[in-house]
Regions:
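Conserved donor NDP-sugar-binding/catalytic core segment of glycosyltransferases
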Residues: 105-139
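N-proximal low-complexity "stem/linker" segments adjacent to membrane-targeting elements
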Residues: 1-33
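A conserved acidic beta->alpha catalytic loop
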Residues: 48-57, 97
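Short beta-strand/loop segment that forms part of the nucleotide-sugar
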Residues: 42-50, 70-71
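Short aromatic/hydrophobic "clamp" motif used to bind/position activated sugar donors
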Residues: 93
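Conserved small/polar residues in nucleotide/adenosyl-binding loops
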Residues: 150-154
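Short, acidic, metal-binding catalytic loop of nucleotide-sugar glycosyltransferases
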Residues: 33-41
């Protein structure tokens, strides 16, 4: 399903949600990557599952750039994701786990530029994932198949 829009005025807000738990070695690169995005309409939400390894201390250092963050026990990744979704107010939601990064500081802007070329807004946006090792060397792309609404409904 797509929605009509005035593509010249399109400036959607992206709610980017990072879920983390005891990721002290990984979370900072993700925070810096999202906070360095050139696109201005980003609502960044971080949900930490009550880490005990210093993860929350790192998140706290960047809280001025966050729309919301919390560090508290949860019932697992899906509970944490739902907490993030409850706080999200954007037009689109984008999950980026601790340790993951966007391709460049212009990734969100590139997505918006592509949206502006469309005649209608999509309900779902997805792309390829570049799998990398600890040294950030590419191990290959993971391509998603086209999404069908029949698979998304109950």
């Amino acid at each position: 399903m797509e929605h009509s829009h005035n593509y010249m005025q399109l400036q959607p807000t992206f709610s980017i949600i990072t879920i983390t738990y005891n990721a002290v070695r990984l979370v900072e690169q993700t925070l810096l990557n999202v906070l360095s995005q050139s696109y201005p309409n980003i609502e960044y939400i971080v949900i930490d599952g009550g880490s005990t390894d210093g993860t929350a201390d790192i998140i706290r250092r960047y809280e001025s750039g966050l729309a919301y963050w919390v560090s508290e026990p949860d019932k697992g990744i899906y509970d944490a994701m739902n907490k993030g979704l409850q706080k999200a107010t954007g037009d689109y939601v984008w999950f980026i786990n601790a340790g993951d990064t966007l391709c460049s500081s212009d990734t969100v802007q590139s997505v918006v530029s592509r949206l502006q070329k469309r005649k209608a807004l999509p309900d779902i946006i997805y792309g390829e994932t570049n799998i990398v090792d600890e040294e950030r060397r590419s191990l290959g792309l993971r391509r998603l198949r086209a999404v069908s609404y029949t698979h998304l409904t109950l």
